[in-house]
């Protein structure tokens, strides 16, 4: 009877181990990578101009003079080619000197914005406008449309500037992409990569716990000394 129980537990433990083994391997590899990488480098700080200081502007008109239908709830100042603009209600750009609305950011203006935030000496390879991205894209969940600026680099370096708010958004490079891929395998969010509460992750975590417990149980039922010890106590 004990032998049958032992064989059943051993069989269950083996199949659970095979089923979960690949995911356990991904968890181990990704955890190892995360613990050995510098997050500042993953964020691309070594490609950024960390000494950048925004320009200060004078002789700006009062925002109340700008003719918009909505009341002003939020306001930020943007520097576009050394000219001040108001970004109002997280929707519109208006000149902070003339009050004229700016409808579109040009490629040259996007390059100017990126140049302020990126390290000096980088050579631009290309710039293109993107209007949509997939769930796994490196610019997912950020403001669109945007300009993606590619630099001549062995690291496949790219910078993103959103058009509607004239804002520098992010830097992407090869190490970040590896981190992003391993993060997906770690969280098991194969839909969008950013959800840490997926049903798949919960299920595999539970199965992993069952696998460990089955291993302890197997060790217990196959070790006579342990069984005798617990019977005595």
PLM feature spans:
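Conserved histidines in hydrophobic membrane contexts and catalytic metal-binding motifs
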Residues: 1-233
């Amino acid at each position: 009877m004990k032998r049958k129980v032992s064989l059943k537990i051993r069989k269950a433990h083996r199949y659970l181990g095979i089923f979960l083994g690949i995911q356990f391997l991904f968890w181990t590899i990704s955890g190892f990578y995360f613990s050995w990488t510098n997050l500042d480098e993953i964020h691309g700080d070594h490609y950024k101009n960390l000494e950048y200081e925004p320009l200060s502007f004078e002789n700006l008109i009062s925002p109340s003079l700008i003719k918009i239908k909505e009341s002003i709830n939020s306001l930020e100042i943007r520097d576009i080619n050394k000219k001040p603009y108001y970004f109002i209600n997280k929707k519109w750009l208006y000149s902070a000197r003339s009050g004229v609305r700016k409808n579109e950011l040009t490629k040259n203006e996007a390059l100017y914005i990126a140049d302020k935030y990126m390290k000096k000496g980088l050579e631009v390879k290309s710039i293109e406008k993107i209007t949509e991205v997939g769930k796994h894209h490196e610019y997912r969940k950020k403001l669109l449309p945007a300009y993606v600026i590619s630099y001549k680099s062995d690291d496949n370096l790219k910078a993103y500037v959103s058009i509607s708010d004239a804002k520098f958004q992010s830097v992407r490079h090869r190490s970040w992409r590896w981190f992003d891929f391993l993060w997906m395998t770690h969280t098991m969010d194969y839909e969008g990569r950013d959800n840490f509460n997926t049903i798949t992750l919960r299920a595999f975590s539970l199965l992993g716990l069952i696998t460990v417990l089955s291993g302890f149980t197997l060790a217990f039922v196959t070790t006579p000394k342990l069984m005798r010890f617990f019977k005595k106590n």
